[in-house]
Amino acid sequence: CSSRTELEMPDAQRDLLDALLKTGKPVVLVHFSGRPTVMTWEQQHVPSILNVWFGGSESADAICDVLFGDVCPSGKLTATFPQNVGQLPMNYNHKNTGRPLAEGRWFEKFRSNYIDVSNDPLYPFGYGLSYTTFAYSDMQLSADSMNKQNGELTASITVTNTGNYDADEIVQLYIRDIVGSITRPVKELKGFQKVKLAPGEEKAVTLTIDKKALSFFDDAKHEWVAEPGKFEAIIGSSSRDVKGTVPFELK
């Protein structure tokens, strides 16, 4: 698919999918692709989409396990899917440049936004559905500051399976540097953990924040640098679906 400049589904495949939908029967779109594509039409018209990338010779067995409910899906996107090709390039860890519009907002005068779609992606980095549901609660940090030389913090949050199926959830830790000597991304993935939960079960998930998680590569110094200052620890089920944010300071 990387040989095509068009990121939407080819017309012949779209016509076939549209014809299947018009039968009135339930349809699941199994989407093979080696890169993010524009799936806005599919998202609006297809009841369910299973993105399988290029899974190899045994992918059919894995796909059947998911479709027939033998396995609860738990995958998360490792790339951002745009609403429109005109949004590209698009990354979850973008810089806070221009006059940015707050996440979830559609349009506001004198802000850096489009007039035909929101700034948000169709499917954000880290996104993924499950046959069950999860609740996050009680995010905490082990301290409100850490030492630059040898300190570290732990971020913890409680995850509960509020649905009816055994399932895995991937808890994601992002870091935001509030003010730096260079422009830093609005958030950067610095850790994640998969947790398996039975229906009604809850577990405390703990993730470590160390100096490396707060560092960036300084081109002038040719080394990794962690600058003292204020940060935010952000835990979510994706880069967009934030479940908790706690500030802390690097001293």
Give residue spans per PLM region.
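Secreted, periplasmic, or luminal enzymes acting at the cell surface/secretory milieu
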Residues: 32-168, 174, 228, 232-236, ...
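Intrinsic-disorder/low-complexity, polar/charged segments enriched in Ser/Thr/Lys/Arg/Asp/Glu/Gln
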Residues: 152-154, 202-206, 243-245
